[in-house]
């Protein structure tokens, strides 16, 4: 792969996710902390109006506005559609990028700790993630759906990925998570600098990759009303194994609903507040061990 010349850090794609938004504000106030000799680092506050309002979005979810067809559709005129076009104008598209790496900062009410969310398994990204999880075992790595036709901001770039941290409430700054996220960003930038110098560290360990397999909705009645909640046995237990027969939900009348799958899964984004409107109680993943150097 060619030399890294420009890196973009985006925060506040969702306006009430303060960790990323305030990190971007810090980096804009003290740009020297993210600059490296061999590449430029630029910062973008993703959704300024939503950030000012303390809301996830103004009219629609900005992180669902980056489908190529949507970016080319001049009839889409919501604030977030316009903002997506502006951001794409800076970052470029996957087939014509203006930057080499995109880091999109997010936070979650789920207990995701320090997570890297990938939309593809590019060898460069896998080696980066293997390095990050090797030096900090608390870093988890997820692989979601293939990015071809994706509407996420990260899909604008082949080397785009998300840093997702939690648990933290919406519209709240948590100093510990802020500092951990900040340090993770510095580690990533250091890695990119070493890559440009040809000094990539060799990783011998396998990478644990949590691969997305599907979503699960809450129990509902015939009117679509929620009739249950996350069972206390799995609340805040993201990335832990869920076996067939384990309790999954607790209904309003106190009955446990078990996981009826046939294989062990590893739930993530358990009880994410922003996913209630999307009909998602959690995401299921399967755990794979891969060799990033193969």
From Swiss-Prot:
The keyword Transcription regulation does not apply. It catalyses: an N-acyl-L-aspartate + H2O = a carboxylate + L-aspartate. InterPro entries: AspA/AstE_fam (IPR050178), Aspartoacylase (IPR016708), AstE_AspA_cat (IPR055438), Aste_AspA_hybrid_dom (IPR007036). SUPFAM superfamilies: Zn-dependent exopeptidases. It is an enzyme of class 3 (hydrolase). GO terms for molecular function: aspartoacylase activity; hydrolase activity, acting on ester bonds; zinc ion binding. Transmembrane segments: none annotated. Its cofactor is Zn(2+). The keyword Metal-binding applies. Substrate binds at residues 56, 63-64, 164, 275. Zn(2+) binds at residues 14, 17, 106. Its EC number is 3.5.1.15. It comes from the Bacteria. One of its GO terms (cellular component) is cytosol. Binds 1 zinc ion per subunit. Keywords: Hydrolase, Metal-binding, Zinc. Belongs to the AspA/AstE family. Aspartoacylase subfamily. PANTHER family: ASPARTOACYLASE, SUCCINYLGLUTAMATE DESUCCINYLASE. This is Probable aspartoacylase.
């Amino acid at each position: 792969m060619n030399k890294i010349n420009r890196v973009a850090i985006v925060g506040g794609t969702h306006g009430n996710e303060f960790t990323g938004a305030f990190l971007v504000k810090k980096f804009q106030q003290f740009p020297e902390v993210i600059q490296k000799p061999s590449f430029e680092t630029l910062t973008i506050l993703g959704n300024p109006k939503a950030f000012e309002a303390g809301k996830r979005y103004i009219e629609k979810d900005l992180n669902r506005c980056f489908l190529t067809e949507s970016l080319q559709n001049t009839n889409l005129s919501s604030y977030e559609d316009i903002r997506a076009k502006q951001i794409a104008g800076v970052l470029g598209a996957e087939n014509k990028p203006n930057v080499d790496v995109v880091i999109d900062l997010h936070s979650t009410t789920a207990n995701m700790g320090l997570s890297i969310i990938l939309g593809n398994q590019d060898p460069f990204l896998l080696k980066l993630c293997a390095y990050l999880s090797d030096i900090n075992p608390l870093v988890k790595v997820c692989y979601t759906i293939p990015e071809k036709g994706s509407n996420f901001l990260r899909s604008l770039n082949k080397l785009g990925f998300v840093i997702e941290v939690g648990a933290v409430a919406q519209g709240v700054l948590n100093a510990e998570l802020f500092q951990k996220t900040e340090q993770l960003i510095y580690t990533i930038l250091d890695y990119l600098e070493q890559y440009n110098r040809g000094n990539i560290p060799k990783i011998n360990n396998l990478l644990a990759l949590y691969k997305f397999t599907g979503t699960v909705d809450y129990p509902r009645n015939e009117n679509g009303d929620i009739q249950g909640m996350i069972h206390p046995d799995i609340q805040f237990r993201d990335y832990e194994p869920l076996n067939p027969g384990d309790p999954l939900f607790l209904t309003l009348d106190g009955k446990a609903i078990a996981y009826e799958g046939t294989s062990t899964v590893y739930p993530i984004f358990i009880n994410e507040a922003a996913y209630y409107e999307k009909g998602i109680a959690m995401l299921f993943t399967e755990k794979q061990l891969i060799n990033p150097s193969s």
